[in-house]
Amino acid sequence: MSNKDLLGRRNFIKGMGAAAGVAMAAPALAVSENANGVKWDKEVEVLIIGSGFAGLAAAIEATRKGAKDVHIFEKMSYFGGNSAINGGLFAAPDTPMQKQEGVKDSVDTMVADQLAAGRGIADEALLRHVAEHAVEALQMTLDAGSEYHPYLQQLGGHSVARTYQTTVSCGAGITQPLLQECRKLGVHTHNRAKFDGFILDEKGGVVGVKMREGYYFDKPESGKLVRIKARRGVIMATGGFAQNINMRMAQDPTLTAEVGCTNAPGATGEGMFEMFRLGAVPVHLAHIQSGPWASPDEGGFGYVSNYSIYNFPHSIAIDRLTGKRFMNEIADRKTRADAELNCRDAQGNPLPPILITSYEDSKQHPNTKKVLKYNVGWKFDSIDALAKHFDVPLAPLKKQIAEYNDYVKTQSDPQFGKNMTEAKGKFIQAPFTVVRLWPKVHYCQGGVQINTNAEVKDSLTGKPISGLYAAGEVCGGIHGVSRLGSCSIPECMVMGMTAARIMMQA
């Protein structure tokens, strides 16, 4: 079975460029109103807020299920949201490429890996629902024209290699084909259209929204207010709040403006806040994830992140103060980020650790050329030159490399228990490529609570709020304490597809 047809059915389009917390939000807040006496400016069948993975998948699925009048509203000037600049990594179990590579995997195995990272508070039912439908979502991207590297990656916390990555190494390799597919299907797409609140019926159900058309992100009060009736309901796919400094500091005071962030500017959380005001259950808001693959030498997600993600399995992370490894390079994100933050100099100041890789192995990833070209990575012909450049004690470093290369030979890491499968035959040897590591805020595990129908739950009754669905990072509680890398895209897409299906059945 080919990489193009995961389900037995039948190119890339170039990329682009809790209630208490509500009061602290930086963005201007929306206010919901009652539908009695409302003069509707327009009426649509399916109304979707947000144009990332979740919103685009919902629109395509709604159309496939018979919807004739589907509208996507995006507050920014460009479509794709934060999804367009993510790493383009998609995890799915029991795929054709796994069979080709001899990787044994299953829904149960993928769920077990995620539950371990969730540290006891992840939502198993939602994780299982996503895993069961992940291949179907992956097929949607392939049908739309997404292209992936012809190999799988084993990301941190995953027990096997199950991750696809777009050939452009970013989410635009998925969002742009999905956006084009939406337009082919007749989905109406509106940018510079900001959500400004829900419109409710007499029972508190969602029957429409207020929007501001002609909105400019740098002018919070801009745009013309319009009221739009949604016959089948509203799907909120508005993303997380990692760029809302006040909100994230309310959850974790250490996440100040000085802490880097990989997210797009629009990840400010207004949609989530308004659902809280409506009565949605807030879940796990304090669990905000930092990416351990980020670099202090570039802004945002940059080039190093995908470089590191690819190379972690066959590289060593070194504490520059000691010259020794300090973590399992493919542990889950929280474990690694916490370990990196403990790397300090003798005075207790941050001392970003380094990731050392054999150039012969690192060059297999296209970002290697970019990290070297833009001086956010370095190439050395000897370990002596490397140690001198980063002021790392030479003797301990040489000893550590020799010990690690023995682990590669024996396929066993007694030091940190790293799974050495993907490191087989890949020794740490000259020439070397090196990048510096330091975590950046990347993902919000918290948001509104949903069920496996993507329905938003009411905090008083525990029942779904009529007419309201949510999918993607705006939802909370799914992953628990820590989300595994490459599990966000399948979650967003599967829950967006689910919301559309349930809405069309209602």
Swiss-Prot record:
<feature type="binding site">
    <location>
        <position position="88"/>
    </location>
    <ligand>
        <name>FAD</name>
    </ligand>
</feature>
<feature type="binding site">
    <location>
        <position position="74"/>
    </location>
    <ligand>
        <name>FAD</name>
    </ligand>
</feature>
<dbReference type="InterPro" id="IPR003953">
    <property type="entry name" value="FAD-dep_OxRdtase_2_FAD-bd"/>
</dbReference>
<keyword id="KW-0274">FAD</keyword>
<dbReference type="InterPro" id="IPR027477">
    <property type="entry name" value="Succ_DH/fumarate_Rdtase_cat_sf"/>
</dbReference>
<feature type="signal peptide" description="Tat-type signal">
    <location>
        <begin position="1"/>
        <end position="30"/>
    </location>
</feature>
<feature type="binding site">
    <location>
        <position position="54"/>
    </location>
    <ligand>
        <name>FAD</name>
    </ligand>
</feature>
<feature type="binding site">
    <location>
        <position position="473"/>
    </location>
    <ligand>
        <name>FAD</name>
    </ligand>
</feature>
<feature type="binding site">
    <location>
        <position position="489"/>
    </location>
    <ligand>
        <name>FAD</name>
    </ligand>
</feature>
<dbReference type="GO" id="GO:0016491">
    <property type="term" value="F:oxidoreductase activity"/>
</dbReference>
<dbReference type="InterPro" id="IPR050315">
    <property type="entry name" value="FAD-oxidoreductase_2"/>
</dbReference>
<keyword id="KW-0574">Periplasm</keyword>
<comment type="function">
    <text>FAD-containing subunit of the ArdAB flavocytochrome c, which catalyzes the reduction of acrylate to propanoate and supports dimethylsulfoniopropionate-dependent anaerobic respiration. In vitro, can use the artificial electron donor methyl viologen. The natural electron donor is probably a low-potential cytochrome c. Also shows weak activity toward methacrylate in vitro (at a 22-fold lower rate) but cannot use other tested 2-enoates, including crotonic, fumaric, sorbic, urocanic, cinnamic, p-coumaric, caffeic or ferulic acids.</text>
</comment>
<protein>
    <recommendedName>
        <fullName>Acrylate reductase flavoprotein subunit</fullName>
        <ecNumber>1.3.2.-</ecNumber>
    </recommendedName>
</protein>
<dbReference type="GO" id="GO:0010181">
    <property type="term" value="F:FMN binding"/>
</dbReference>
<comment type="similarity">
    <text>Belongs to the FAD-dependent oxidoreductase 2 family. FRD/SDH subfamily.</text>
</comment>
<dbReference type="GO" id="GO:0042597">
    <property type="term" value="C:periplasmic space"/>
</dbReference>
<feature type="active site" description="Proton donor">
    <location>
        <position position="333"/>
    </location>
</feature>
<feature type="binding site">
    <location>
        <position position="87"/>
    </location>
    <ligand>
        <name>FAD</name>
    </ligand>
</feature>
<dbReference type="Pfam" id="PF00890">
    <property type="entry name" value="FAD_binding_2"/>
</dbReference>
<dbReference type="InterPro" id="IPR006311">
    <property type="entry name" value="TAT_signal"/>
</dbReference>
<keyword id="KW-0732">Signal</keyword>
<feature type="binding site">
    <location>
        <position position="82"/>
    </location>
    <ligand>
        <name>FAD</name>
    </ligand>
</feature>
<keyword id="KW-0560">Oxidoreductase</keyword>
<comment type="subunit">
    <text>The ArdAB flavocytochrome c is composed of a FAD-containing subunit (ArdA) and a heme c-containing subunit (ArdB).</text>
</comment>
<dbReference type="InterPro" id="IPR010960">
    <property type="entry name" value="Flavocytochrome_c"/>
</dbReference>
<keyword id="KW-0285">Flavoprotein</keyword>
<dbReference type="InterPro" id="IPR036188">
    <property type="entry name" value="FAD/NAD-bd_sf"/>
</dbReference>
